[in-house]
């Protein structure tokens, strides 16, 4: 399915279009997340972030410009990865003494 048709269907609330987007772009999104995190995230964290990217797509598909879906997904994936890395860097375990 081409990007424009996929976006049109997403904008009309078509859940099958979301499933198609996940099938078509999940490997790309996970690769972006993995490369951006430089292996600092577990595969489970990478998958969780990828799910979050597609949830954001579902919520914000009206803001995606036609013909730019892949770039938009990559940008969201990079931003979410950086946010996760920042958050994990700021978390300091408390000693239980």
Regions found by a protein language model. Give the residues of each.
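Hydrophobic side chains within well-formed alpha-helices
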Residues: 3-6, 17, 49, 69, ...
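Short acidic/histidine-centered micro-motifs embedded in hydrophobic/aromatic stretches
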Residues: 24, 52, 97
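Arg/Lys-rich amphipathic alpha helix in sigma70-family domain 2
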Residues: 63, 75-95
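Conserved short alpha-helical segment within the catalytic ATP-binding HATPase_c
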Residues: 54, 58, 77-78
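N-terminal module of bacterial RNA polymerase sigma factors
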Residues: 1-27
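Short, aromatic/basic-enriched loop-to-helix "N-cap" motif that marks the start
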Residues: 45-48, 61-75
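Short, charged helix-capping/linker segments at alpha-helix termini
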Residues: 12-20, 30-52, 63
């Amino acid at each position: 399915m081409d990007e424009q048709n996929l976006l049109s269907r997403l904008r009309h609330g078509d859940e099958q279009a979301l499933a198609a987007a996940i099938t078509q772009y999940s490997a790309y999104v996970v690769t972006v997340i993995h490369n951006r995190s430089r292996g600092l995230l577990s595969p489970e964290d990478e998958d969780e972030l990828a799910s979050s990217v597609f949830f954001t797509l579902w919520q914000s598909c009206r803001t995606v410009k036609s013909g730019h879906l892949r770039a938009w997904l990559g940008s969201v994936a990079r931003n979410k990865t950086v946010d996760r890395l920042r958050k994990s860097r700021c978390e300091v375990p408390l000693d239980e003494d």
